[in-house]
Regions:
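RNA-interacting cores
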Residues: 1-267
């Protein structure tokens, strides 16, 4: 069951909270511990649902919105599998200490004050969310898409929908919307594009095993979109369901760097 949790932390001033570092800190909490294989973890209910740290593809958790104040730092964590909420809750019960930084003595140490489930819907409920026809879509973090290893320069409702449909298909195939018909979606959805292109540094170390140097930069989108569809059209209904799912996951590629967080509000 998809869910969203807000965690507030006691934090020092000037927390180095980049999306990439936050995602890395989350993975240390939610992924399988090093040395435990998925086959071994499958024998234990508390571990079976946790993803391998080095698994390719999209993780069943992601960053959401962030908020800052003088002494408090807040993070929204989105889940496609609410069993991981129990994992997060267990971590909170043990003190909820999170280290952020580059793995040095200068790392910031955050202490969780509380965690609260702020949204939760069943897959059946999401499948019925097909009545919305207009959305304001804000790109909370830079967002990029790729296909077969190549960057996709355009940003369209169909591109966003395809990414979300793939996530739904992975985590609940029975209720997932059908494969996106790009032509049908383009014919019924109108878009006002207020995004801009930016270059984002992946800052990947040379030993990451992906053939990229630390100076590797990729193009991404920032800004917002206004999308509206024809009421009653099947493609609009499919897009409505997928926009509902976007509250519990991210979109696009390079999500392990904290990219692809969107906020879609139905108008």
């Amino acid at each position: 069951m998809p869910a969203s949790v807000y965690v507030s932390f006691d934090a020092p001033e000037g927390v180095p909270a980049t999306p990439r570092r936050l995602h890395a800190a989350l993975s240390a909490i939610l992924d399988l511990p090093p040395g435990i294989s998925p086959a071994r973890a499958a024998k234990f209910p508390t571990l079976a649902h946790r993803p391998p740290h080095d698994a390719g593809g999209v993780k069943p958790y992601s960053l959401g919105e962030l908020c800052h104040s003088e002494s408090t730092f807040g993070v929204e964590v989105r889940f496609l599998d609410d069993r991981l909420v129990d994992t997060l809750d267990a971590w909170l019960s043990w003190g909820g200490v999170m280290r952020l930084g580059a793995g040095t003595e200068d790392d910031a140490v955050l202490i969780a004050r509380e965690g609260q489930v702020i949204a939760q819907e069943s897959w059946e409920e999401l499948a019925q969310r097909d009545k919305d026809t207009a959305w304001e879509v804000r790109l909370v973090t830079p967002t990029t898409f790729s296909s077969k290893g190549n960057h996709v320069p355009s940003l369209s409702p169909a591109t966003i929908a395809t990414s979300l449909q793939q996530r739904w298909w992975t985590w609940n195939r029975r209720l997932a919307p059908p494969r996106i018909d790009r032509h049908a979606m383009a014919s019924v959805l109108a878009t006002q594009d207020f995004t801009r292109s930016s270059m984002v540094s992946l800052a990947m170390p040379r030993n990451a095993g992906q053939g990229r140097l630390s100076s590797r930069r990729i193009p991404a989108h920032e800004g917002h979109l206004r999308i509206s569809g024809i009421e009653g059209a099947e493609a609009t209904q499919v897009f409505s369901r997928l926009m509902a799912l976007s509250a519990y996951t991210n979109v696009g590629s390079h999500t392990s760097f904290g990219m692809g967080v969107i906020d879609a509000v139905a108008a």
